[in-house]
Amino acid sequence: MADKLGSSETLAERLQQQYRYDPVRAYRKLKNYRRRRRIRRYGVAAGILLVLGLGWGWFHQNSTDDSLLLTQTIQPGSKKAVLTLADGSVWHIGDSAMLISTAQNHIRIDSSGMLLQAGKEEKPESTDTYHLLSIPRGGEFTMTLADGTRVWLNSESELHFPLQFGGKQRKVQLTGEAYFEVAKDAAHPFVVEVCDSKIQVLGTGFNVRSYSEEGQIVTTLVEGTVCFESIEDRVILKPGEQSILDKEGRLQKRAVEVYPFVAWKEGRFIFRKQRLEDIMVMVSRWYNVEVYFEDDESKEITFSGGMMRNDGFEALMKMIETVGSINCTIKDNTVFIAKRK
């Protein structure tokens, strides 16, 4: 078995070089190769990108091992959000088209997300009036602000925003994770307030991750330039750089591979030598499940690979079982993980 896995790794590494930014194409190539070689013992599970030690490979074990116990079907997340306007009215929104009208503005929702449209009234809404878009566990949503800035919001995230921007800055407030594609306006910097810190840009694409339970603010820059400013320090980021502010107030900057940090907005999970405990934090938000580790050793197992976020939860857990030599039991929306003995 080790020899067969090794040969698959070698092929996967070659494909990764050839199709570095197209894992789906690489998977199809690997699938055709395996069919020609007629390796019967292993099947390919579409959507699972797996690294075994040194290289990437699309792999799924077609085993008779039934250690994964499912008592219910776990569905992936979907487009859904709760919009709370400043007047206290609450709207539950999703893919269905709808139009919400305020005294001065319109909020249009369709399959592409939420779009803010300014009205033509003589007395526009005060720019000090902020509304709230909340994304629950198992949800995601996209919105376009009044200035044309697009925002992708991940599960368990909140964005405070005005229906219209005014003054010298375009300011929003974020909790959780979001990707911003900021409309260019040199005269009016775009500012994202996160806890006691702020990120200032003119026109750029960047990701911000700030969940209270994680104890850090991670800003990853895709294009343009941003300035991250904490209470005590500040850094300027260039494309391919990331700032991390920890709970002790320490601010650091480093160069990173950007894609794993922004792949979620394109419907993918991408992992690069990540601890299983950290992976399950992301997975639990998207699939809206609880996770319980029965031993500390399982938390430290590292994985590299990826899959589509809309793939089945069972496929993901079987992949983790196979690679990590662990047992997973799912009961009452809770995943129990233990090191295989």
Tell what function each PLM region has.
Residues 9, 19, 53-56:
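Prokaryotic Sec-type signal peptides and long signal-anchor helices
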Residues 1-10:
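N-terminal amphipathic alpha-helical interaction or autoinhibitory segments
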